[in-house]
Structures are given as C-alpha cells and as structure tokens.
Amino acid sequence: MKKPAEAKALWQKIDRGEWDIIVGTQLLLRRGPLPTMGLVGIVQADAGLSVPDFRSAERTYHTLLDAVALADPAGAGGQVILQTSLASHHAIQALAQDDESLFLSEELSHRGALGYPPSVHLIALLVSGTDGNMVRDAATAWAARLTACASPAVAGQTSERKTRPIAPLMGRPGPLIILGPAPSPVTKLRGRYRWQILVKSLERQTGIEVVRTTVKDMERTHHRRSIKFDVDVDPIEMW
C-alpha cells in the first residue's frame, strides 16, 4: 500500500468484519482497537526474546498480550495458538497461564542476578566512525580508561557521596562494572562502523561523573569528524 487512502480502505474492511482470515504483522496491534476473533495464531512468538536487549522479554510479553487480546474470551470459544521453541521461558509461561505476577517475579529475579535495571543504572556508550579499525581502537581505549576510573579508589574521588559496591550483584569489586567494548548489534549504519560499551552502576551519579571525565579525554585525543562518542544514560534502546 503506497497511498493513505488504500490503508484507510483496508482498515475499514477489517472493522466491518468483511474478511474471515486476517494475516498481518505487529502493525495490526499498533492501530488501536480491533474486532475480536475466534482464533488467533502467533508464528514464532518467541522471536523477540533473542534481541540483545535486557528488555526483550518485557517487550515480547506485552506484544503477545496485545495479540492475545484480539481473541474472543475463552468462554465464548476464543482460542490462541502460539508457535514457540522456548515454551519454558517465563514470558511464554506467564502468557499461557494468564499470570502477570509470574512474569514480574521471574523478570525481576533475572535482572537482579545479572545486574540490570531496576537493580542498577545503565549508561550505554557508542563509538562510531568511517574507519572500522580506528573505531575499534578508540572503543578499546575508552573502555580501558573507564576501567581505570572505575576502581574503588578512583571512583570514590569523583563523587562526594559514598559509593556502594556493586559486588553483591555481580561478584566483582568496585562501584562500577564496564562491559565491552564489542561491535554493536547494528555494526554499520549510514556508512559508520559502531562499537559499544556498557557501564553499570548502583549510584547513577557516580557512573555519570566517570563517563563525563573519560569522554572529555577521548574527545581531546580524537578528531570529532573521524570518531564520534555518544553517551546514553538510562537507555531505552540497547543497539
């Protein structure tokens, strides 16, 4: 469909119930209220769980909830069929059992064990440029500076507040944990290579101050046109 009028005509047919079978993507769920259906089938329902983002289970669960809501109530004969190879995953189990508390408790437990929000604060760092080797080297240098600044003694000097160790969550010393560098899941975008670093901190301000100090150092030693350093505090997207 290339014209808005064509899309509008299609939605009107769906609203009037002119078709017995509707095949669509997640776009159907974004449109708003739809007439309920006797049978809803979801192909590869677990596909979103493989996205390299700590929120992937949460997003998948809510997307599937919206899809399930398209089915008539069970008492009226409504049915939902999910295709999945991860039937034991808590997002799938919570959906199958219609138990939101199951999903919440399992998700919070997993995030706490791995050191992800809401247990800790995250800062996502992105290094990009047109020269792949230069981007990799810059990301490696930034991670090394972050690691040096993340030592308990140094990090404690960057903030007037007393920092708490993150060790109870991840079994590592110090108030910060530096993950990476690693190629971004989207390794190249608009001609620019991309590497990422993830900073974890129990104290949000401590992480911000360490990153602020190191990014200034990196920008002084790298020309901005060749290498770009992006900082995303409490990121919504991880890639």
PLM regions with names:
Residues 54-63:
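Substrate-gripping "pore-loop 1 plus following alpha2 helix"
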